[in-house]
Amino acid sequence: MWKVRGSSSVKYKSKSLFRFLPLILLVGMAFCPRVQSSQANVAYFAGGCFWCTEAVFQQAPGVTSVVSGYMQKAETVQVTFDPAKTTYDKLLNLFWRAHDPTEVDAQGPDTGKQYRSALFFVDEQQHLAAEKSKAQAQKSYSKSIATEITRAGSFRPAPENHQNFCRKNPNNPYVRQIIEPKLKKLGLKKP
């Protein structure tokens, strides 16, 4: 409120600061460092048995850790990555190549809803990237992609005997017959 001068009585004129709000926000955004969500470096992928998915993402450049677990009753891997060395888009590309996204509630010999294909996004940027990459990946398949794309919920790590399964169990028949051929097809080495 402003006092109007030259008046015998005190009058106040209301000036709204709201008209300056866009300018204030723009100036603030220009001079303040951009804050990234701590979740921006985390991605969740469900591509069948988490032993396979874990082994694939452990070989991806820029990935700093992979944890096998469960999200929304699907075997899922939590992938932490360094955005200076890789991008979510590159990880999505690897995800599509690492499994058959047209299979419903199954991957290879593993069947059941827990083996479904799913992408769990942590923010709107990941959501948009996942939808875009799914549309792009669909061009490579004659059948419809069954991968669900949904907001990430609570992630529950699997017991320790499921973590780093391929590294800990290199002679396991599942590793030899399922994981190793998958890694070879992708041009990746066994972890």
Regions found by a protein language model. Give the residues of each.
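Flexible coil/turn and secondary-structure edge motifs
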Residues: 2, 31-191
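Bacterial N-terminal signal peptides
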Residues: 11-12, 19-30
